[in-house]
Amino acid sequence: MRDDQIFNLIEKEKLREKEHIELIASENFTSLEIRQAVGSVLTNKYAEGYPLNRYYGGCSFIDEIETLAILRAKELFGAKYANVQPHSGSQANMAAIMALINPGDRILGMQLSHGGHLTHGSRVNFSGIFFNTYFYGVSRDSELIDYDEVLKIARDCRPNLIIAGASSYSREIDFKKFREIADDVSAYLLCDIAHIAGLIVAGFHNSSIDVAHLTTSTTHKTLRGPRGGIILSGKDFNKLVTFNGKEKTLSNAVNSTVFPGTQGGPLVHVIAGKAIAFREALQENFKEYISKVIKNTKVMAEYFKSEGFRIVSGGTDNHLFLVDLSSLDLTGADAEKLLERVNITLNKNAIPFDKKSPALASGIRIGGAAITSRGLNESDSLNVAKFIVRALKTRSDIELKQIKKEVVRFIRDFDMP
């Protein structure tokens, strides 16, 4: 019997996505092929272990699928090693951290309120519960990462692991400088490229693969794949590490921390979706897509500046930027709810040195990846920014209703992938 309750809600979500302007920087739209793979019979199969070494029978086709995903990931990122099994970016980070250091060791990561991520040492996350954590941030003046300050902090706290990467930092990250700092204090370097993976494989951001000991990423966001995680390594993939009191290559240690260390059976249907996403990202038109993402994002940021808004760090080099709403006496939480009323979806976000709590926040985060997937160009993105500014400045019910009508009429012209 059909579950009408669930399928009616799915249809409502489908309509919401079609009639809303999606600006959440961590979201994107997958291709139909990816959705078909993720919704396929592969969801039925249990496959603990790795290709040719499973704990269950009947995995011959599963082995081929996972092997394809691994080969495509290695080709796409220029990596020597890839593990495509992590269920999420957070689980990829957990497995990577466990392969490199032991509970109680020291981690130096980016301050969450300055653009970092929960898994980079936050006290409420496994990374801050099981490890001793220290933090670097951005300069108060420039709102850019101060690498000299990172080195100073690293020399003071002597971390076993440094994590480079961010969830709301709009500038290019110099991974080579982070490796120099890590080498200076004899630490491992883990680079989390979840947000910028698409930019890296398209050649619009420097790569961490041969710089970091390990690189982690999600497979959605700018990669446009299904929700999931991946762990990669370049020239250090065969480096010997001490794991559970024994010497192992780094790649073997990661395989152990993914399964059986943090997961059981992999999500084979999602791995198939990842394989398709990697193939899509290997096509020439993916570079064109990422180029448009960056242009669209810059256009929006510049319009906000022209309207008197302060953009954190003064601009953007990637797919996102933060808008400081302090001049409007409006919290990020208020703005998020206000814009939802006009069918524009984004998220509240703390800004560096924010005096408001994370639940309120002083800023909003805006991303250009999803709208670009729907075919919006620079002129269209400018219109999106204008809708937002109008809504934030007016706040009157009558005007908000009018903006919503205009938004729906505008965005309906752009097909969903």
Swiss-Prot record:
GO biological process: one example: tetrahydrofolate interconversion
Record localization: Cytoplasm
Keywords noted in UniProt: Amino-acid biosynthesis, Cytoplasm, One-carbon metabolism, Pyridoxal phosphate, Transferase
Any one Pfam family match given in the protein's UniProt record, by short name: SHMT
Pathway linked to the protein: One-carbon metabolism; tetrahydrofolate interconversion; Amino-acid biosynthesis; glycine biosynthesis; glycine from L-serine: step 1/1
Modified residues (N6-(pyridoxal phosphate)lysine): K221
SUPFAM superfamilies from the UniProt entry: PLP-dependent transferases
Keyword Cytoplasm: yes
Function in brief: Catalyzes the reversible interconversion of serine and glycine with tetrahydrofolate (THF) serving as the one-carbon carrier. This reaction serves as the major source of one-carbon groups required for the biosynthesis of purines, thymidylate, methionine, and other important biomolecules. Also exhibits THF-independent aldolase activity toward beta-hydroxyamino acids, producing glycine and aldehydes, via a retro-aldol mechanism.
UniProt protein name: Serine hydroxymethyltransferase
Organism (species): Borreliella afzelii (strain PKo) (Borrelia afzelii)
